[in-house]
Each structure stands twice: as C-alpha cells, then as structure tokens.
C-alpha cells in the first residue's frame, strides 16, 4: 500500500471536512475506494470539487504546503510535496454536484468508498467508466499501460457488462463524429 498517498488523502479530506468542503476521490483511487482495497500504485490523486469553491480548495492545498502547478481545460494540477493532485470541478445541478458531461450521479453525496478505514466520497462507477471512454478516444486501449487495463477491467466488472454497454452506447451517441 502507498502509505504516503493514503496519508495525504486522509489529510486532504480532514482539512476539507473542517471547511465543510465536499471532495470526491476520482480515477484509480476511486476504484480502490469503491472496492475497499488498494489495487495498485497510483501516479496521482484525482479530486473532484465544487467548482464555485475552487479558491477554497486552492487555499487548502497551500495550507497543506502545496501549490497549483498547471491550469488544464478541465481543471488544474497541484502538488503537495512530491504528490500530484489532478483536480476537476463539479457543478451544482438541481439536487447534486455533477461533473460536466458525465452521467448523472457522478458525485454521490454519501461516502460510497473506504480508503484505509476512512469512509470517502468518490465518483460513481459510471463516471469512472465514462473517463475511460474519453481516455480510449485519446489513446487506443491496446496502447494503455497494464495498470489502466487492469483498473478498467475492475471497474467494468464492478459495474457489470450490461451497464457498461449502455454507457458506451450513450457515450458514442453523444460524441459521434
């Protein structure tokens, strides 16, 4: 288990709790949280945050000794120590926060995962799979590193083949060229 990242995740979430700032774990750590176990080494920590509270997240990162390092078309990157944070906003949509363009329910209010004994909010299985569809548009799956192939397999197995195919069809119809 990568105790450095686990410790940092716990620190980030504790600081966010003090500010009543909801954060969702995304990417590979979301898969691990939903499964309740660490499945691999992670290159970064993906976080989803309320878009209108970005300044609070940035201040919190600075308070934890970090800094924003790069602006991206979907959010920003930050570093705390040697750890990379990949931060993406979610926006309030009637009853819940949602990631833009992701399937509804992308940011569940409840803590639906666990990282080293701590309950955590994490992106939905559907949002995780949706991200892999974007990734497949950028990099053919045959060229994916083994860790991404395995994480995608775990996510698909957890969601179920039928639901994955429904999502894939929705993705294709939305982004058909």
Swiss-Prot record:
Annotated binding of Mg(2+) 1, by residue: 44, 46
Pfam families, A to Z: Aminoglyc_resit (PF10706)
Keyword terms of this UniProt record: Antibiotic resistance, Magnesium, Metal-binding, Nucleotidyltransferase, Plasmid, Transferase
Entry cofactors: Mg(2+)
Cofactor note (record): Binds 2 Mg(2+).
Catalytic residues (UniProt): 86
GO biological process, one term: response to antibiotic
Gene3D superfamilies in the record: 3.30.460.40
Keyword Transferase: yes
EC number: 2.7.7.46
Catalytic activity: nucleoside triphosphate + gentamicin = diphosphate + 2''-nucleotidylgentamicin
UniProt binding sites for Mg(2+) 2: 44, 46, 86
InterPro entries xrefs: Aminoglyc_AdlTrfase
Single GO term (MF): metal ion binding
NCBIfam families named in the record: ANT_2pp_Ia (NF000064)
Function: Mediates bacterial resistance to kanamycin, gentamicin, dibekacin, sisomicin, neomycin and tobramycin by adenylating the 2''-hydroxyl group of these antibiotics.
Protein name, UniProt field: 2''-aminoglycoside nucleotidyltransferase
Organism: Klebsiella pneumoniae
Lineage: Bacteria, Pseudomonadati, Pseudomonadota, Gammaproteobacteria, Enterobacterales
Gene from which this protein is expressed: aadB
């Amino acid at each position: 288990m990568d105790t450095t990242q686990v410790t940092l995740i716990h620190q980030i979430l504790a600081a966010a709790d003090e500010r009543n700032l909801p954060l969702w774990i995304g990417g590979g750590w979301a898969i691990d949280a939903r499964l309740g176990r660490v499945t691999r080494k992670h290159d970064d920590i993906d976080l989803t945050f309320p878009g209108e509270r970005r300044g609070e997240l940035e201040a919190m990162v600075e308070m934890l000794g970090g800094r924003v390092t790069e602006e991206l078309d979907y959010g920003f990157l930050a570093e705390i120590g040697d750890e990379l944070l990949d931060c993406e906003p979610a926006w309030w949509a009637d009853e819940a926060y949602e990631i833009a363009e992701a399937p509804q329910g992308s940011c569940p209010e409840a803590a639906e995962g666990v990282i080293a004994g701590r309950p955590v909010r994490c992106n939905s299985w559907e949002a995780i799979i949706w991200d892999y569809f974007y990734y497949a548009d950028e990099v053919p799956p045959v060229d994916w590193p083994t860790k991404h192939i395995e994480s995608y397999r775990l996510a698909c197995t957890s969601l179920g083949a039928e639901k994955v195919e429904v999502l894939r069809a929705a993705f294709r119809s939305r982004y058909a060229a």
